[in-house]
Amino acid sequence: MVKKKIAISCGDIQGIGLELILKSHKEVSVLCEPLYLIHSELLGRANQLLTNAYEVKPLNAIAINSPLPSFNSSTIGKVSAQSGAYSFESFRKACELADDKEVDSICTMPINKLAWQQAQIPFVGHTDFLKQRYKEHQIIMMLGCPKLFVGLFSDHVPLRAVSQLIQVKALVQFLLAFQKSTQAQIIQVCGFNPHAGEEGLFGEEDEKILKAIQESNQTLGFECFLGPLPADSAFAPNKRQITPFYVSMSHDVGLAPLKALYFDESINVSLNAPILRASTDHGTAFDIAYQNKANNKSYLNAIKYLSQRL
């Protein structure tokens, strides 16, 4: 069977991304044909910081159109506008290759959002960039593993803004797009307010969620969406036995239980996009950068997910 070609953006080089690339290359090469979007000298420098623990020569790396950031023992673990600009250009190039069908999919290493901001990148993160690049598609952030997947109706927005986003029409569009992308037959939807609103006692948002669920099920012709469920008990073991697929109105309500249960193995997937993209479900981990402590399970699971897609 022909291996899938996967473009791998480098993420913020001051974090654990390059350690993950170097320590996982042999396993990744069994699963796919990786193409690393980074200057090869930066990989060599990363290996030196890791006491030359890994083999660099076999890696297929292509230089990107960006100045090399400062990168040495005094810069690692620190926010840098240079590194932010470099990580963005690596990601942008990966998307370009996927658009041009030169690769089958892309896998992204973690970036530092503050570094992007300091580099004056006008996007909060990977998903925000994809939403702007592919405006005609409703890009959905889904995180998880086969035991539990959570789709986020809102992602990197202030919690105070989520209430205004919960509108029946927008939520119906989201629910139907999520079901189409996952092909899940049962999806549990978390409520927004305590006790899922207690029939309107604690706010009107959950009444809107209920109406969106009813309209979505009617459109599908079967009872796919269940809820809104009180979020404080939605992820109880007996609930997770019903289905691994959930929808959360806000970022932390869905991701707190996911990361408590499956932090090391979860991945981040961009659904409903014209290109296939997956990522690690963790950040740059500046505090352990270049200490040979990075856990590569999430990265390998992201590669496995991409390599198994049609």
Swiss-Prot record:
Pfam families named in the record: PdxA
UniProt: a divalent metal cation binding residues: H156, H195, H251
Enzyme Commission (EC) number: 1.1.1.262
Catalytic activity entry: 4-(phosphooxy)-L-threonine + NAD(+) = 3-amino-2-oxopropyl phosphate + CO2 + NADH
One GO term describing the cellular component: cytoplasm
Pathway(s) the chain acts in: Cofactor biosynthesis; pyridoxine 5'-phosphate biosynthesis; pyridoxine 5'-phosphate from D-erythrose 4-phosphate: step 4/5
Names of the cofactor(s): Zn(2+); Mg(2+); Co(2+)
One of the record's GO molecular function terms: 4-hydroxythreonine-4-phosphate dehydrogenase activity
Keywords from the named record: Cobalt, Cytoplasm, Magnesium, Metal-binding, NAD, NADP, Oxidoreductase, Pyridoxine biosynthesis, Zinc
Functional summary from the UniProt entry: Catalyzes the NAD(P)-dependent oxidation of 4-(phosphooxy)-L-threonine (HTP) into 2-amino-3-oxo-4-(phosphooxy)butyric acid which spontaneously decarboxylates to form 3-amino-2-oxopropyl phosphate (AHAP).
Known partners and oligomeric status: Homodimer.
Protein name: 4-hydroxythreonine-4-phosphate dehydrogenase
Taxonomic lineage: Bacteria, Pseudomonadati, Campylobacterota, Epsilonproteobacteria, Campylobacterales
